[in-house]
A protein has these predicted regions:
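Alpha-helical transmembrane segments
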Residues: 11-15
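Bacterial N-terminal signal peptides that target proteins for export
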Residues: 1-9
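C-terminal motif of bacterial Sec signal peptides marking the signal peptidase cleavage site
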Residues: 17-20
Length: 162
């Protein structure tokens, strides 16, 4: 009985070590302009340099010109509707008087970057993903994706130590 208990404790300890040593990391990149802010949040496997998920937050500040606000909302709604039927994609949107926003969550286990049928249905989504998700050696590489978006002006946000 004591041997079983000791073995169980050792196995439980090993399990905690394995869980604690996962190589999953998160990085946030921001591109801010006068009228908009785009944030990419990558969750990736550090050891394999593979992107696991990508969350894109887009916030557009509306001008005081009603026609511009209406056109911006219509364009956002078109883009959101294109994405809704795409597998591995979750889209949410928020409206206020001063800004519109939407969030696109990509689960790389389900999302097919090379799917021509989905690409035809949601061209705006794939135009963005072609910039944010870069393949290298047959997989979506975090380091290649990071290099590409930094070249376009995105700045990595360093996590503050508590």
């Amino acid at each position: 009985m004591k041997k079983i208990l000791k073995l169980s404790i050792v196995l439980l300890g090993a399990l905690f070590v394995l869980i604690g040593c996962r190589s999953e990391s998160k990085s946030v990149f921001v591109l801010q302009t006068e009228h908009s802010k785009v944030t990419y949040t990558y969750v990736y496997d550090k050891g394999n340099d593979t992107v696991l998920s990508l969350t894109t937050d887009i916030v557009v500040r509306l001008s005081s010109v009603p026609e511009y606000a209406t056109a911006a909302r219509q364009r956002r709604d078109e883009i959101v509707n294109q994405m809704k039927a795409t597998e591995g994609v979750k889209v949410t949107s928020v409206d206020s008087e001063k800004e519109i926003a939407f969030t696109v969550e990509i689960d790389m286990k389900k999302f097919k970057l090379d799917d021509s049928e989905s690409r035809a249905k949601a061209p705006s989504l794939y135009e963005t993903m072609d910039v944010a998700l870069i393949k290298k050696d047959g997989k979506v590489s975090f380091s290649a994706s990071k290099e590409n978006i930094e070249r376009l002006g995105f700045v990595e946000q360093k996590e503050e130590k508590k």
